[in-house]
Every structure is written in structure tokens, then in C-alpha cells.
């Protein structure tokens, strides 16, 4: 599978799938319907497009997880994490802020700063310096 490179950003073609573990030295943009059957390690920022899947854990600097993405293992970030509507994640561990949008299903969430829960989510324990829960009316 050919991955396109633009400066320090790697771009995966839509609908691609990867059978083994993937390690990217830079940022990674993943379009919708892309599948990783193994572990995904990104040394920069990760943007996972809608309806993508990761069969094992994800390690990255910052993460934006698109709607209805499924990550079967943990998501570990040294920065911020945004989990969009309907995402399913094994667990989240972030050094900075975590935002959970409506419909997210996640195990435990551990944050070094703030956990912002927008709307109704299914989760295990929420551990952070501050946990804010607001209605689903925010964009």
C-alpha cells in the first residue's frame, strides 16, 4: 500500500488496510474506512477518519479520532485526545486534555489535565485533574 508524504505528514489512501504493525515517523492523516489490523505507532499527530479501525493499541503525540472509529486496544497520547461521536476505544491515557463527544464508548480514561464529556457517553472510570460534563449542545 502506498502512503503519500507531504513534508512531515503521511497520508494514507482511502479504504486502505494494513495487516501488520505500523510505525510512522511524523504526522498521519487517515481517511475514512481505513483499517489497521495491528498496532499503530505515530511519532507525531494522528487524525483517524470516520469508520476506521485499529486492531490493537495506538500510541501518538495528539489524536483526533473520527466518528464511529473502533480502536480495540488502548489509545495512549503524550498530548491531547478528541474522540468524536460514536467512537469505540478500549481505554484512553493522555498526558493533557481529553474530550469525549456524544455516543463514545470507552473503558477507563486517564488524563493529566481535563476530561471534557459532551453529552451521553459510556465509560469506565474517569481520572483527571478536572472532569467537566456538559450537555450535547456544543458543536
Q: How would you name each of these model-derived features?
A:
Residues 1-139:
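Extended beta-solenoid/beta-helix repeat architectures
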Amino acid at each position: 500500500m502506498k502512503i503519500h508524504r507531504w513534508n512531515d505528514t503521511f497520508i494514507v489512501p482511502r479504504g486502505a488496510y494494513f495487516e501488520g504493525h505500523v510505525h510512522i515517523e511524523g504526522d498521519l492523516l487517515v481517511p475514512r474506512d481505513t483499517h489497521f489490523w495491528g498496532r499503530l505507532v505515530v511519532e507525531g499527530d494522528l487524525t483517524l477518519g470516520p469508520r476506521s479501525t485499529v486492531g490493537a493499541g495506538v500510541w501518538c503525540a495528539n489524536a483526533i479520532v473520527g466518528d464511529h472509529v473502533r480502536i480495540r486496544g488502548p489509545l495512549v497520547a503524550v498530548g491531547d485526545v478528541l474522540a468524536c461521536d460514536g467512537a469505540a476505544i478500549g481505554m484512553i491515557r493522555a498526558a493533557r486534555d481529553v474530550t469525549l463527544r456524544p455516543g463514545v464508548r470507552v473503558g477507563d480514561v486517564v488524563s493529566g489535565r481535563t476530561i471534557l464529556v459532551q453529552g451521553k457517553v459510556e465509560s469506565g472510570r474517569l481520572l483527571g485533574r478536572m472532569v467537566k460534563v456538559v450537555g450535547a449542545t456544543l458543536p
